[in-house]
Amino acid sequence: MSSKVEQLRAQLNERILVLDGGMGTMIQSYRLNEADFRGERFADWPCDLKGNNDLLVLSKPEVIAAIHNAYFEAGADIIETNTFNSTTIAMADYQMESLSAEINFAAAKLARACADEWTARTPEKPRYVAGVLGPTNRTASISPDVNDPAFRNITFDGLVAAYRESTKALVEGGADLILIETVFDTLNAKAAVFAVKTEFEALGVELPIMISGTITDASGRTLSGQTTEAFYNSLRHAEALTFGLNCALGPDELRQYVQELSRIAECYVTAHPNAGLPNAFGEYDLDADTMAKQIREWAQAGFLNIVGGCCGTTPQHIAAMSRAVEGLAPRKLPEIPVACRLSGLEPLNIGEDSLFVNVGERTNVTGSAKFKRLIKEEKYSEALDVARQQVENGAQIIDINMDEGMLDAEAAMVRFLNLIAGEPDIARVPIMIDSSKWDVIEKGLKCIQGKGIVNSISMKEGVDAFIHHAKLLRRYGAAVVVMAFDEQGQADTRARKIEICRRAYKILTEEVGFPPEDIIFDPNIFAVATGIEEHNNYAQDFIGACEDIKRELPHALISGGVSNVSFSFRGNDPVREAIHAVFLYYAIRNGMDMGIVNAGQLAIYDDLPAELRDAVEDVILNRRDDGTERLLELAEKYRGSKTDDTANAQQAEWRSWEVNKRLEYSLVKGITEFIEQDTEEARQQATRPIEVIEGPLMDGMNVVGDLFGEGKMFLPQVVKSARVMKQAVAYLEPFIEASKEQGKTNGKMVIATVKGDVHDIGKNIVGVVLQCNNYEIVDLGVMVPAEKILRTAKEVNADLIGLSGLITPSLDEMVNVAKEMERQGFTIPLLIGGATTSKAHTAVKIEQNYSGPTVYVQNASRTVGVVAALLSDTQRDDFVARTRKEYETVRIQHGRKKPRTPPVTLEAARDNDFAFDWQAYTPPVAHRLGVQEVEASIETLRNYIDWTPFFMTWSLAGKYPRILEDEVVGVEAQRLFKDANDMLDKLSAEKTLNPRGVVGLFPANRVGDDIEIYRDETRTHVINVSHHLRQQTEKTGFANYCLADFVAPKLSGKADYIGAFAVTGGLEEDALADAFEAQHDDYNKIMVKALADRLAEAFAEYLHERVRKVYWGYAPNENLSNEELIRENYQGIRPAPGYPACPEHTEKATIWELLEVEKHTGMKLTESFAMWPGASVSGWYFSHPDSKYYAVAQIQRDQVEDYARRKGMSVTEVERWLAPNLGYDAD
């Protein structure tokens, strides 16, 4: 270890060190242009170079040096080289692969010079350089082609070559450490570790390695799907100096994952979060002092050894952090229990206290005839089902073997492992790569991002080959199965087994440096009851060897192929299962940790028939000389039988319960099949029909409510429960009506979507959740005027009123309802909810207009608690007082709140518009001008569906497809996803929901902040004008955008175009939902609305693709996956009126006039410019390659007056439509 490394370790033990902040953020502040990036050397480079930040170490080194020095001056101990994208792979985007080594070397040398200068100034505070290896722009474990999940656009070897070249240059340029950062695909990082270790060996150096991963969203997983602990387990073999997290999230969101890492990591922990989450402009708003306060709390909690900043952070942030952690003790390295720490997408830790681990054996061509056939016939989809079944049946690891004479084992292994990577329900468990061919093993290791197991290596080919393979496995980061096999052959006796294992253990731990907990011995399981006397003690020898290994070889694990022991009884599954059960019973007691088994065919030792168990024990323990003969005689009795014939009986057992328990079970499980039958039975037993509702049905719903409140049931399950409840109540209603009885409820609530708004999915869900908790709901539907809401509330004597809305004009209508409630003397609570609502708006705009309780409810899951408190005699006063005090604080803070960035005049904003050389650009000519009706089938659109918002509708948080394997909601998400696809199948087959739309392309040019739209190419007749708003806050280093900027100015003489569209998931949406409601089926009512919404968004995506490739035709060769479409990785944008880039809703009327939308599609606009049906999307098309989404945000009075003049509206009217965007008080 060098003196510098020793010095660094000493510093880490004494204090929290500080890393630098965002490099890209600082480069942007210089507002460099294309010429700056090129410099003299690259003036004639054949492609654009602006944005190639890493190139600046050659073309503008003074800028990068200034940024390094600014961070050192701010207090940074470590700076990162400007090489995030300097691999040959990433540099290919700029045709600069050949410059990779030069850029890395120059970057390290430049950072080294800055660090040495600052160390010379303050020798007591040495400065260090971390040579950065970025993630590249490729993913080794994710297919870029949605139609071919086995395809990869980069290989492990390709990554290793690129990372080796960069590492060599960074080391030679003077880096003190190598930082592998922003890891979103762990397989890329494993390749980086392999490359760094290999290059260190070639150079004869050993620098500390830092690793930092990226948790991409609230799911708590990397982009490639791993949890924090799985990610750590996968890279633990790097023996990194530090392990940490950076990017994607701000301190609030990242905290829990840093906390988890600090608990599990044996090394030092780093964190460099973003300055919060990006705002609508893609900028970061978290100021330095606020961020530093959060970081100080982390440090005080003992999470940190090194801290810095990522996107959006500046020297001001780093200076504040440096002050915040000064004097605080660094995190102490924890003592972590020794365990074999494996991973798939999720961790699997096998320690001393772990239960037996099942390794699924059926994905093995040598052991499963079915699997072999599927692989040979290339039926990989069915082969995946075999793997999935093993996991579903309890396999915690799956063993994969492709060794078959007529197979290309390498190709089959690679393809199957790549396919598994795209199946989260399989990939969540670790992989055991099983082969007798080293080349196959290596190919497999290059495909798995988790920490897997290699099965196997041995000393049969000599010690040199054994050591060579073991060293490579260590570098790949795999645990290893070591066979009890040496130059003399397989160990068959207990003495030979421990002799070979002892020798292998010594070589691995002392010569190779292999962690003992990653060594898994297979002392050879051989078949018993073969009729050969020498074989009689095979099982007992294995069991005894387990005891020897555990006693003599600390932390080593034991495994074996369990099916081998029963091979003599192949064809007699019940006897084989009994042999396995008895064998495992004794082997596990003696230390066996895991076994390769058929996870779906494991019998339970205590459940075996006594005579069979005793006979098997005689054989396994070799207790009788005639044990084999006796078992053979008995075996025929059990051939073809099943030891667990009770499965079907258990499944139907609940039908034998007493009726009240059956009703509860049906409610909790959402089973409608028997509900009328059981409800009638309960009615026959009750004195009055109402007692069935107030008794067993409400008891069951109380269980549902409790489970939902405790997080043990999820919204889709609750809605299914409500469906059962409604059908039971509907059955009882005629009997109740005949007896003139009314049930007792917890309260009555009128709910409605306000006038002008047609969106009701969220409202419907709230209604269902409250009904499940015995509240009576009077649902008035959508577009309900204030007068009707209040009249109904009086008529039904409501206890509460709930208002919902999605579009921004609904906010004003909610204020109007509150004013009317006050005027009419209401005192009952008013609840506010919906996508555009907020606590701030409720406090500032609504509550002050109504003296009764006014409460903002964020989501359905919180509604029950709020309603219960408001109607409680004991809780109400306190809850209302606390809420009013909270809202008063919100109003005070709102009044004091200053804009994050100061406003500028409209004139100044226009002077800072999007600067573009229109003379050097020719806009693409639209191929098909005019208006066209468009239809698309559900089967076409389902390929374009973004499912993540669908799950959000049902309050299931997580990103698709990873949500399907989520530890908490995964099972329910899978059920919901199946139900959704079943309904799509039905809607498609029956054609009961028919998406339709209209699109138009028109000649157009910009005039100021407006876009003139022309009748034809003569451009002499203006048929309409699209009016737009400009960003009006100070934008240092950025333009003040307006959508009109992306269309060629009229004065430029360039012919440009604009597109418009309107699509709906189907006019039949409401009728279908009403039909389900009539059947008391809230679940399918909400489902059809949610799917119609998804189909509308999918239609918009599909139509935009058609416009780019065909109608406008500026991207005819575009070939994007659905994920890439969702991420909008294409040229052009389709902003929608009412959304951040064009927030004013009345502009939809321009689209309706241009396209004659109602005539072509039947879609309508309400008085508030909401679209009907609710599942509808409309917007504009822009083709400009630099067009982008942004948020207009707050505008000032001068722009409002200008906009009113341009639109021919009064200022007051414009202020009403743009109320959320006003940067001044309009009252």
Curated annotation (Swiss-Prot):
Keyword ATP-binding on entry: no
Ranges where the B12-binding N-terminal domain occurs: 650-744
Catalytic activity: (6S)-5-methyl-5,6,7,8-tetrahydrofolate + L-homocysteine = (6S)-5,6,7,8-tetrahydrofolate + L-methionine
Molecular function terms, GO-annotated: cobalamin binding; methionine synthase activity; zinc ion binding
UniProt: S-adenosyl-L-methionine binding residues: 946, 1134, 1189-1190
SUPFAM superfamilies documented for this protein: Cobalamin (vitamin B12)-binding domain, Dihydropteroate synthetase-like, Homocysteine S-methyltransferase, Methionine synthase activation domain-like, Methionine synthase domain
The protein's name in its UniProt record: Methionine synthase
Organism whose genome encodes this protein: Escherichia coli (strain K12)
